[in-house]
């Protein structure tokens, strides 16, 4: 499942995939795969992404049944 919430939060913050990758210590490809739903990040990476974007884990990674 695509992570639209993550992509929207990144774009709203004015960050490219590379910018977010640099902030979180991963590659741009990893951020792209997470956004496409092709990669399940570790909890530590989820926390780093959320902190970098000023969001909570729920804001970015919680999926409601109707989503």
Per-range role (PLM):
Residues 11, 39-40:
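Short amphipathic helical patch at the helix-1/turn junction of helix-turn-helix
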Residues 26-39:
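Recognition helix of helix-turn-helix/homeodomain-like DNA-binding domains
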Residues 44-59:
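DNA major-groove recognition helix of helix-turn-helix/homeodomain DNA-binding modules
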């Amino acid at each position: 499942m695509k992570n639209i919430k993550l992509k929207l939060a990144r774009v709203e913050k004015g960050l490219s995939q590379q910018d977010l990758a640099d902030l979180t210590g991963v590659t741009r490809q990893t951020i792209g795969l997470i956004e496409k739903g092709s990669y399940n990040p570790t909890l530590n990476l989820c926390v780093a992404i959320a902190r970098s974007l000023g969001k909570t884990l729920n804001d970015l990674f919680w999926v409601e049944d109707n989503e």
